[in-house]
Each structure stands twice: as structure tokens, then as C-alpha cells.
Curated annotation (Swiss-Prot):
Positions with a binding annotation for Zn(2+) 1: C60, C62, C75, C78
Alphabetized SUPFAM superfamilies for the sequence: beta and beta-prime subunits of DNA dependent RNA-polymerase
GO molecular function, one term: magnesium ion binding
Protein name, as recorded: DNA-directed RNA polymerase subunit beta'
GO cellular component labels: DNA-directed RNA polymerase complex
Entry note: cofactor: Binds 1 Mg(2+) ion per subunit. Binds 2 Zn(2+) ions per subunit.
Names of the cofactor(s): Mg(2+); Zn(2+)
Gene name per UniProt: rpoC
Reaction equations catalysed: RNA(n) + a ribonucleoside 5'-triphosphate = RNA(n+1) + diphosphate
EC code(s) of this entry: 2.7.7.6
Role this protein plays: DNA-dependent RNA polymerase catalyzes the transcription of DNA into RNA using the four ribonucleoside triphosphates as substrates.
Native organism: Enterococcus faecalis (strain ATCC 700802 / V583)
Coiled coil: none
Sites where the protein binds Zn(2+) 2: C818, C892, C899, C902
Binding site for Mg(2+): D449, D451, D453
Length: 1217
């Protein structure tokens, strides 16, 4: 038995008429669908049961044979085979055409495939196919030329002149004869000769024709198959007809299109039988051609065929195209069973790995499991009975449900799923009500809030799926963000506020200076009101649990607060006692300044000490990162839960409220504003006198008001009260920031007009005073623009992610080490003097290419090919090293993917990346997901030229699509010295002259451009002469691939870092490498490749290797930079490309070439329903055989042995630390 699910690759080709007939189960001769009286399919019609199979299982049309026992019998009365009705989804029919018809895809696409094969223009072809002109097929011994077009009149004249000496015809039959006459081998040989001498337009055309003729020759497709004698009819259940109430029918558009084809075909047959005049027959043939065109691709030529209400009918091509087409709707995005959705509400009582599932949803989702248990425990007699019990909701059902859902994780997903953290696994806990309960800490990963968001639940059914959900997707596992390796589950809002309030210090509150013997005593005193949470007190260190104090500290008394004692209880025991929010305290030890000798006057000592700042959101994040680094997943998730509970508890105790009295009045405000008005007046006077231009006046006015706003903000910060609830909220990072506060208590400042220009009229009032009508009106512009921007940005960002995923979906970690000897030299990314991305962040989690040596001592810090950890990265930077050569995705030699060493650490887990990790998809999500945070607009600074550099999302799109950038910089093509920069006021241009070793070049740059070089500078080729963005395609011509890759990486990082978004370099490297994986062949040498062909670097190297081994001359090529859309469409997989964009074009091309899809990427395998070749679906993991272990093998430990061993190892590690 062949396993239909096991195949290596998938091929597409043109179908010959014989092939179409062999698929068919019978010819459809009548346009009828079903009989409206009996509602049975008509014989020989579009739904005929003889052709397509029975409409009811195991029952023929006339009802003579019913039941399964007649399986396989063909009824002698109605001719219907007795079988399952689902064969109506797979059996095809056909229509024998009375005249050949051209296939619109091959005639109409750009370039016209038929036109290239016949060397005719598409216009000429159209005239022939649609019966406007005759074409000469055999000129005989006349003066006519082959393939010459003749009008009706010319044809008649020539017939009179030459009689039957020549053959000419019109319509698709003529084209078919011409295609049959094409001698592929001869044409190919002739074109190859032509190529040797041809140039320009002629050469391009020759290469194009050669390409297509070679394709036909190699694939075994006949060119004449582009014209069809017979049309397949797709199975009826794929174009259903359903009865609506009221006796009307709804039908698929395809049935209408097929009906028109059959009607016209039958009419044509009748006309031919009657020997009708040729003009009538021609007209009918043309109509048949148009009907078939509409069936295959309605609207491609002329006006589309419309149905009721002037709606164009959906043809076969439309069934595949677009978001609603077969590819994206049914193959890449399927609906799944065992799923539900509901509104989410917060579940603060949950553990990190739990979610609350409403009971009625759970019983529906886990129905089969519960039913099985009911039958197995003999509570129910059979499955039917068990189902009834569940539907009635009997008591024993709920007990069993509780047991069934234990240890059975479910997946929660929130749309839009922008990155892999948008789907996580949780263990369900049954809850009352109808809402799903979500753990508050995972909200950030999902970007969820509880204002009515909904989430979907999915149940992993089989053992493997459950194991994967538990091991890889459990929410407690997903603590780090894959885009930068920082924790994604930092506490927010109330949790931050609670911990902030808990760790505050205040002067002179009750109980200040008291001394306690241990924690419990201090906490008891607080609970009974003797000590305030924020009062500084003394505690004996010896009794503070097992905290790692130094010997010097152990003899002394620690000055801290009750709040901090409580806060430290949730920390791991090995952590230093956290008394101040500093890195030193977190990573080294509690600073000595908080310890005093026993017998000191503690209240007096406390009065001298400054107050310590409380722990803010950022500090909590650092604590979590440190816990993760030292203790890994389990401990971190427990610790997060403790932090969450503590935060909620103490934010409740704190009782933060906001009232109007909390917004204080700033008395200096009026004076500042009056001063600003005076300055503006002075500036206006200067403008009136003509001392400054209008642009300068505008710039200065804006500057004055911004200055006033900043001054007010500064005054507000200075007069801020530390116990002010609004200040506490913004300072802790719980909600809001200082600019919100300025708008409440200071002034709102300047607003943007609808065109993005800043208006000179400031809003002087703040929200406490209230705005005037005019101010209110001005401020609505900005608010509206904000809303529209966000909406547009979301769509743009989503589309960017889709393109990124498509281009990188087949990049998977394929092997351990590719053995490359190349590397990438990296340094900190700078913009002017400002560091955009420091070196240690770029080094972290990468493998070195060469060993790194300390510049002063000469000691080796790290050897070659070793992983750089946090500590090593810091050590390298501290040693003053500025450049390090590392292994990079750019220089990896692995085919169709990356190796472990070139990729380095997996940012999402903090450990080495595993073979099988789908790093391409992760990279695409990491770049696409923050896309919504980037700004939309191109910044236009008021009237200053040369400053319009695109930023934000448009710039990212510009880079990844490899477009010519706006505000392009001029680059030099030679390495040398700038010898002259001259200005020509007449032409308003500057000329820059560079003297290289061999030649001297002069570049003209616009007068307004800001120069980046000065006379006497030594510059390298590819260096920019002016400010602006470099065109990467130009850079590629001047420099090598690695320089371009490096430039693109720096540019992308710049955009994201300017917006405060951190992304790991390796994600951008993966994407950029995909843009540069193709080459264009310049000279084919002795290979079979055509000049100008685009191909994969790996494939090109293989072909050249074979040629060299055979003793031939290898081909030469040059690298090509493709934008991500273009790169996706150029992939080797036609399934992946067709499901991305331009479906018909991709399929047309693939069919002619008889392309084989090797099914290497993820998308292709999802489409055909195979398990994806990444992660556990990789061959090396699927084909593992269980090894037989001897009965009493010495290598088999019991679980308890292993646990004891691990505990001992951990203890050793801690001692070594």
C-alpha cells in the first residue's frame, strides 16, 4: 500500500488533452444542473451522478441498489456506481470542444508565453485568436511569409491570386498548428548562435525566448498544449449548488461559467453539423474562446462576465488568488475543531502556568476525553449515553472533567499574533462565569488588556502535541522576548506601584530608629501599628535568614525598612539583601554603608543618612533578568508570581488615589509665559524689519515655546512632592510619564497641524485650568492624526511582517557547524558621537571567529569559536577592545539555512540554539512585531532643505524592499584623497574631485547638500560624500556583498534604536542574507546556464563545480540585491511563491518549466498538509528509533539517583561561584 502522505517533492506541468481525458469519468454534454421538480441531478449535466458519483452514500440514482453490501456495483438501470458520496469531491469530468481554444494564462500574461515561443507580438496573436486576422501557416511557393497576418480582404485577394498554394487560418486552431510546427531543438540552436553576436534589445529578446524554449524542452511539455481541445470540469462538490428557503437556489459562479461554455460549444457543434456559413461559425468560435477565457480568468481580457447585480463572476483564477483564495484561506489558514473563544478578564490568583477556563467551555472542549472516562468507569453504558449525560450536565460529569483537564495544557491565542508569544500554553483551571481568566503577567507578551479583548482556546489532542505544548510553549517557559532576549514578563501597573510603595523610605514616620532582632519581629511590629512600612529601622543581620552577608557585615546591624524586609522575602535565598536599586547591590553584595556597629545611636545615625530611592519598574526588570540568568525558568516563574502577589497586596494597602488637589499649581508659570510672549514679539519685530527670513522666524518662535514648556516642566519636577500619588505612579513606571504631568499641571505646549507642520500658536493652559475653545479646537488635529496614523500603521506593519515571514520562512538551523573560515568584524554602531548599539550588546550570545586578546596584557580573553557570555562581553569591552571578529549569519555556508555556530545563542531561551529551530520566522516576527511602535511620518523640519530623511516604518520598508532611498547620498567609486571641493553658484551645484591610485573622479552634488567630507580627507570607495541614505544597489556595485550587508544591518538598527526598540542583530542578519542570496549570471562559460539568469548562490556554485570537474570553463556572475517581495517570488518553491503574491503569474511560469517543489520550506509543507521540516518535524528527529537497552544495564539510573546527582552538581557550582 502506498502511503499517499509520503512524497519527496511536488511537480506542476501543462496537461495534455490525453491527460485531461484520463482524469475524467465522463463527458459533460448538457448545461443543465439539477431538475427543479425532483431536485435530482440531470443526466450528462454538470452534476450528473453517472460521471461524478452518487449524491447519497452507497445508493445509486434510481434507488435499485441501497446499502453498503452492494459496494462497487454499477447499477444497470442508471449507470451510477454504488460508493461513498465524497467521491463527488474528487471525480472530474471533461468537455470535448468543437474547436481548439487558447489558454488565456499563456497567451495574456506578461510576457506572453505563446508570443515568445512563436516569436509573434501579443497584439498579432490576439488578432488571430479572436478572429480578426488570418495568419499564414504554410506560405508554399508564394511571396507570403510564414506567420504573416492578413486581413479578411487581403486573404480573399491572395486566395484569388494564389489559389490553394498557401495555407492560412484564423483562431486558436491556427495558433495550435503554428505551435505544433515549432522545432524546439532547432530554434534553441539558432538562438544560441544569435546570442554570440546580438546586443541591446535584440539580445534581451533572444535570451527571453531561449529561456522559454529551453523550459519547454527540459520539462517535456509540448508548446501546443497551451491550446486546449478538451476542458476539465472540476468535481461538483467543489462548486456546490444549495437550496435556500423559498425554493430558490444559490450556486457557485463556476457553474454559470461552465454553463456558458457548454451552451456555446453545443451550438458550435450544431452549426458545424449544419455546414453553416463560415462567418457564423467564426463568430461562434470566438464566443466559445471568450467563454473559456472567462471560465479560466474572468476579467483578464475585455470586460468581465457579470452575474446578477453587475457583479463580476469568480473564475478559477480568482478561486486561488488573494486573501480569500484557496491558498491563503483554506491551505495556509484552516479552521480547527476543539477550539473556543471568549472575553478575557484578569486572574490575579493564578500561577504563571495557569489560565482560568469557564466550565461550560471546558466541558465542550474536553467532551471526548470526558466521554471516554465515563464509559471506562462504567458510569455510562456507551458513548451515546455518555454524551447524553454530559448534555444534561449531571454531577459526576464535573468531577471527571476536573480530573481530565489536569496536566492537559491548552493553547491561548490573541489576534493579532505578531510574534511567537501570541500563542502560549497554560494548564486550565475551571472557573465560574463565562470569561477566560488570564494571568496578569502574560498580558505584555500578548499585548492584551481587559477592556473587552477576546482570546481563542485550542486543545492539543495527541500525546506529542501535549508534550510540545508543555515543554516548549508553557507560559512559564516564555519569559524572555525572542527579539532581544530581555524578559517580556516584567510586572506592570499595580504590581509596580505596590512594590514601589513597599520599598519607599520616609523621614520621621512612626517607629523610626527602632531595632528588631529578626524579620518576624519587625513585620509583627508593623502589623500592629508600632512601625510604619517606610520608617528606617535596624535589624540584626545574623538573624536575617541565609542571606549572603560578608563576615564584616554579619556582626553589625542593618539599617533598612519593614517594607524592604518583606520585599526581600520573595527573593531567592542566594541573592544579596536588596537595600538599594543598584546593579552593585543586585550582583555583588549589599553596600557596607547600610551597616552600623552595635551600640551606635541609631536614630541619630538615620537622621544623617539620605533617603534611598524605591525600586522602580526598570529595577524590577533587572532583578528578573538576574534571577533568570542564575536560576533559569522554574525559579524565575515562581519568583514572578511572588512579586505579582506582593505588588497587588501592597498597592491595595497603599490606597493610591488621584484627585484634582494632587495636581499642584505652579506659581512661576505666568512669569515664564509672559517672558516667552515678549521674546516672540521681539522675533516678529526682527522679521518685520527684514533682519530674518520667515523660516528663521518660524524656527525661533517654535524654539521659544519649546523652551518655555521645558522650563515649566523642570520647575514642576523640582517642586514635586515624593508622596504625591501622580508622581509616584509616573516615577515608579506604573502609568504615565513626566510629559503627561506637564500637560496636567504645566502647559500643553505646541500642537501639530493636519499637514504635520507644528503650529506657532501654543496651548498655554493645562488640563487643571481647562482649555479655551480655540485651544481645544487646535488640539483636535493632533488627536485625530494620532488615531488615523495608528490605524494605517497597524496595516502597514502587518503587511511588512507578512513579507518578511515569506522571504525567510525556510531559514532553519540545519547543522551544528558549517565550518566557514569567514567572519564579520563588528564594532559599536554610532551615529555621530552617539552610540546607537554598544559593542557588548552586539557580542552577547555570538561565537568568536578568532580568539580575542587583551590589548595590554596579551592574555587570551576568549578562544576562537567559543560562545561569548554576558561576563565575557563585559570583559572584552572593559579591556578597551573596539573591534571583534565573530561568526555571523552573513558568512554562514549552510545551504537553505544557518548553522548553530554562525547563529549563536537563541535569544528566547538564553541557551544555544537547537538544530531545527525556525530562526527565519522568528527573525521576521522580531522585526515585524515592533513595527507598530515605529512612527509613520517622514519628518519635515520647517523649510530646511536636505533634511528630509525618511525615518520610522517607511524607512524600514525602503531598506527591506531595496528601493532607491529618499534623500540619497552621493558615494565615491574610488579609494583616494579628496583633492578639491568647488562651488558653482550659476548651476547651483558643488563639484567634489577625488584622486585615486589609477583614476580621478569628479562628482556633482546639489548646492544644498550637507557635505560629509572635506578637502584632504582620505576616503574608501563606497563612502558617502554627502549626508543622506546610501542606495544599497549602488554600494553593491562599488563594494563587496559583506559591506552592503553590514550597511543594511546598521541602518535597520538605527531606525529601531531611535524609537527605543531593541532588536538582536542576528534577526536582521537573517533577513538581509535572504535579500542577497541570488546572483545574476554574466557569462555562462561552458555551463548550460543562460546569461542574465537569476539563481541561488549555492546552486550556481554546484553547477560551476560540475563544469570544472568536467574540464570546462566556469560561469561568471555578480551578486544581486533583491527586495523582500521580489526575493519571496524568486524562491525555488512555486507553492510558497504562489501563495504569497501574483498567484497566476507564478503558476503559469512554474507549469511551463515543469517545476519541482523540493518542499524544503515551512509554507510548502503546511499547504500540502505535511508536518513542517523544523523543530520536532525535522527528519533527524522524526526518524529516531528507540534503542533496546539491556535489562540490567549499568547505565540506567532511577529518577531519584539522577535528582540526587543534579543536586550535588548544583551545590558544587554554587561553591565554585
Amino acid at each position: 500500500m502506498i502511503d499517499v502522505n509520503k512524497f519527496e517533492s511536488m511537480q506542476i506541468g501543462l496537461a495534455s488533452p490525453e491527460k485531461i481525458r484520463s482524469w475524467s469519468y465522463g463527458e459533460v454534454k448538457k448545461p443543465e444542473t439539477i431538475n427543479y421538480r425532483t431536485l435530482k441531478p440531470e443526466r450528462e449535466g454538470l452534476f450528473c451522478e453517472r460521471i461524478f458519483g452518487p449524491t447519497k452514500d452507497w445508493e445509486c440514482a434510481c434507488g435499485k441498489y441501497k446499502r453498503i453490501r452492494y459496494k462497487g456495483i454499477v447499477c444497470d438501470r442508471c449507470g451510477v456506481e454504488v460508493t461513498r458520496s465524497k467521491v463527488r469531491r474528487e471525480r472530474m469530468g471533461h468537455i470535448e470542444l468543437a474547436a481548439p481554444v487558447s489558454h488565456i494564462w499563456y497567451f495574456k500574461g506578461i510576457p506572453s508565453r505563446m508570443g515568445l515561443v512563436l516569436d509573434m507580438s501579443p497584439r498579432a496573436l490576439e488578432e488571430v485568436i479572436y478572429f480578426a486576422s488570418y495568419v499564414v501557416i504554410e506560405p508554399g511557393d508564394t511571396t507570403l511569409e510564414k506567420k504573416q497576418l492578413l486581413t479578411e480582404r487581403e486573404y480573399r485577394e491572395k486566395r484569388e491570386q494564389y489559389g490553394q498554394a498557401f495555407k492560412a487560418a484564423m483562431g486558436a486552431e491556427a495558433v495550435k498548428q503554428l505551435l505544433d510546427n515549432v522545432d524546439l531543438d532547432g530554434e534553441v540552436a539558432q538562438l544560441k548562435e544569435e546570442l554570440k553576436t546580438a546586443s541591446g534589445q535584440k539580445r534581451t529578446r533572444a535570451i527571453r525566448r531561449l529561456d522559454i524554449l529551453e523550459a519547454f524542452r527540459a520539462s517535456g511539455n509540448q508548446p501546443s498544449w497551451m491550446v486546449m481541445d478538451v476542458i476539465p470540469v472540476i468535481p461538483p462538490d467543489l462548486r456546490p449548488m444549495v437550496q435556500l428557503e423559498g425554493g430558490r437556489f444559490a450556486t457557485s459562479d463556476l457553474n454559470d461559467l461552465y454553463r456558458r461554455v457548454i451552451n456555446r460549444n453545443n451550438r458550435l457543434k450544431r452549426l458545424l453539423d449544419l455546414n453553416a456559413p463560415s462567418i457564423i461559425v467564426q463568430n461562434e468560435k470566438r464566443m466559445l474562446q471568450e467563454a473559456v477565457d472567462a471560465l479560466i480568468d474572468n476579467g483578464r481580457r475585455g470586460r468581465p462576465v457579470t452575474g446578477p447585480g453587475n457583479r463580476p463572476l469568480k473564475s478559477l483564477s480568482h478561486m486561488l488568488k488573494g486573501k480569500q483564495g484557496r491558498f491563503r484561506q483554506n491551505l495556509l489558514g484552516k479552521r480547527v475543531d476543539y477550539s473556543g473563544r471568549s472575553v478575557i478578564v484578569v486572574g490575579p490568583f493564578l500561577k504563571m502556568y495557569q489560565c482560568g477556563l469557564p466550565k461550560e467551555m471546558a466541558i465542550e472542549l474536553f467532551k471526548p476525553f470526558v466521554m471516554r472516562e465515563l464509559v471506562q468507569r462504567e458510569i455510562a453504558t456507551n458513548i451515546k449515553n455518555a454524551k447524553r449525560k454530559i448534555e444534561r450536565g449531571e454531577d459526576e460529569v464535573w468531577d471527571i472533567l476536573e480530573e481530565v483537564i489536569q496536566e492537559h495544557p491548552v493553547l491561548l491565542n490573541r489576534a493579532p499574533t505578531l510574534h511567537r508569544l501570541g500563542i502560549q500554553a497554560f494548564e486550565p483551571v475551571l472557573v465560574e462565569g463565562r470569561a477566560i481568566r488570564l494571568h496578569p503577567l502574560v498580558c505584555e507578551a500578548y499585548n492584551a488588556d481587559f477592556d473587552g479583548d477576546q482570546m481563542a482556546v485550542h486543545v492539543p489532542l495527541n500525546e506529542e502535541a501535549q508534550a510540545e505544548a508543555r515543554m516548549l510553549m508553557l507560559a512559564a517557559q516564555n519569559i524572555l522576548n525572542p527579539k532581544d532576549g530581555k524578559p517580556v514578563v516584567t510586572p506592570s501597573q499595580d504590581m509596580v506601584l505596590g512594590n514601589y510603595y513597599l520599598t519607599m523610605e520616609e523621614e520621621g514616620r512612626e517607629g523610626e530608629g527602632m531595632i528588631f532582632r529578626d524579620m518576624n519581629e519587625a513585620v509583627l511590629a508593623w502589623q500592629n501599628g508600632y512601625v510604619h512600612l517606610h520608617s528606617r529601622i535596624g535589624v540584626q543581620t545574623t538573624l536575617l535568614g541565609d542571606k549572603p552577608f560578608t563576615d564584616w557585615q554579619k556582626e553589625r546591624i542593618l539599617i533598612t525598612t519593614v517594607g524592604k524586609i518583606i520585599f526581600n522575602e520573595i527573593m531567592p535565598v542566594e541573592f544579596p539583601y536588596l537595600n538599594e536599586p543598584t546593579d552593585y547591590n543586585l550582583t555583588v553584595q549589599t553596600p557596607d554603608k547600610y551597616f552600623v556597629e552595635a551600640g551606635t545611636d541609631i536614630p541619630a545615625h538615620i537622621k544623617e543618612q539620605e533617603l534611598v530611592l524605591p525600586f522602580k519598574k526598570k529595577n524590577l526588570g533587572n532583578i528578573i533578568a538576574e534571577v533568570f540568568k542564575r536560576f533559569h525558568i522554574t525559579e524565575t516563574s515562581k519568583m514572578l508570581d511572588r512579586m505579582k502577589d506582593l505588588g497587588y497586596k501592597h498597592s491595595t494597602y497603599a490606597g493610591m488615589t488621584v484627585g484634582i488637589a494632587d495636581i499642584m499649581v505652579l506659581h512661576e508659570k505666568q512669569a515664564i509665559i509672559d517672558a516667552a510672549h515678549k521674546q516672540v514679539e521681539t522675533i516678529t519685530k526682527q522679521f518685520r524689519r527684514g533682519l530674518i527670513t520667515d523660516d528663521e522666524r518660524y524656527e525661533r518662535v517654535i524654539g521659544v515655546w519649546n523652551g518655555a514648556k521645558d522650563e515649566i516642566q523642570q520647575k514642576l519636577i523640582e517642586s514635586m512632592e515624593a508622596r504625591n500619588p501622580i508622581f509616584m505612579m509616573s516615577d515608579s513606571g506604573a502609568r504615565g510619564n513626566i510629559s503627561n504631568f506637564t500637560q496636567l499641571a504645566g502647559m500643553r505646549g505646541l500642537m501639530a497641524a493636519p499637514n504635520g507642520r507644528i503650529m506657532e500658536l501654543p496651548i498655554i493652559s493645562n488640563f487643571r485650568e481647562g482649555l479655551s475653545v480655540l485651544e481645544m479646537f487646535i488640539s483636535t488635529h493632533g488627536a485625530r492624526k494620532g488615531m488615523t496614523d495608528t490605524a494605517l500603521k497597524t496595516a502597514d506593519s502587518g503587511y511588512l511582517t507578512r513579507r518578511l515571514v515569506d522571504v525567510a520562512q525556510d531559514v532553519i538551523i540545519r547543522e551544528d557547524d558549517c565550518g566557514t573560515d569567514r567572519g564579520l568584524e563588528i564594532e559599536a554602531i554610532r551615529e555621530g558621537n552617539e552610540i546607537i548599539e554598544p559593542l557588548d550588546e552586539r557580542l552577547l550570545g555570538r561565537y568568536t571567529r578568532k580568539s580575542v586578546v587583551h590589548p595590554e596584557t596579551g592574555a587570551i580573553i576568549i578562544g576562537a569559536d567559543q560562545l561569548i557570555t554576558e561576563d565575557l562581553a563585559r570583559e572584552i569591552v572593559d579591556a578597551g577592545i573596539e573591534k571583534v571578529t565573530i561568526r555571523s549569519v552573513f558568512t554562514c555556508n549552510t545551504k537553505h539555512g544557518v548553522c548553530k555556530h554562525c547563529y549563536g545563542r537563541n535569544l528566547a531561551t538564553g541557551s544555544d540554539v537547537e538544530v531545527g529551530e525556525a530562526v527565519g520566522t522568528i527573525a521576521a516576527q522580531s522585526i515585524g512585531e515592533p513595527g507598530t511602535q515605529l512612527t509613520m511620518r517622514t519628518f519635515h523640519t520647517g523649510g530646511v532643505a536636505g533634511d528630509d530623511i525618511t525615518q520610522g516604518l517607511p524607512r524600514i520598508q525602503e531598506i527591506f524592499e531595496a528601493r532607491n532611498p529618499k534623500g540619497q547620498a552621493v558615494i565615491t567609486e574610488v579609494t583616494g584623497e579628496v583633492i578639491d571641493i568647488s562651488e558653482d553658484p550659476a548651476t547651483r551645484q558643488k563639484e567634489v574631485t577625488i584622486k585615486g591610485k589609477t583614476d580621478t573622479r569628479t562628482y556633482t552634488v546639489p548646492y544644498t547638500a550637507r557635505m560629509k567630507v572635506a578637502e584632504g580627507d582620505i576616503i574608501h570607495r563606497g563612502a558617502p560624500l554627502t549626508e543622506g541614505s546610501i542606495d544599497p544597489k549602488q554600494l553593491l556595485q562599488v563594494r563587496d556583498v559583506l559591506s552592503v550587508e553590514n550597511y543594511l544591518l546598521r541602518e535597520v538598527q538605527r531606525v529601531y534604536r531611535m524609537q527605543g526598540v531593541e532588536i538582536g542583530d542576528k534577526h536582521i542578519e537573517v533577513m538581509v542574507r535572504q535579500m542577497l542570496r541570488k546572483i545574476r549570471v554574466m557569462d555562462p562559460g561552458d555551463t548550460e546556464i543562460l546569461p542574465g539568469t537569476l539563481m541561488d548562490i549555492a546552486e550556481f556554485k554546484d553547477r560551476n563545480y560540475d563544469t570544472l570537474v568536467a574540464g570546462g570553463v566556469p560561469a561568471t556572475s555578480r551578486p544581486v540585491l533583491l527586495g523582500i517581495t521580489k526575493a519571496s517570488l524568486e524562491t525555488n518553491s512555486f507553492l510558497s511563491a504562489a501563495s504569497f503574491q501574483e498567484t497566476t503569474r507564478v503558476l503559469t511560469d512554474a507549469a511551463i518549466r515543469g517545476k519541482k517543489d523540493p518542499l524544503l520550506g515551512l509554507k510548502e509543507n503546511v499547504i500540502i498538509g505535511k508536518i513542517i521540516p523544523a523543530g520536532t518535524g525535522m527528519a533527524r528527529y522524526r526518524n529516531m528509533e528507540p534503542k533496546e537497552v539491556g535489562v540490567a544495564s549499568e547505565n540506567v539510573y532511577s529518577i531519584s539517583d539522577i535528582e540526587a546527582q543534579m543536586a550535588a552538581e548544583d551545590a558544587m557550582k554554587n561553591i565554585n561561584k
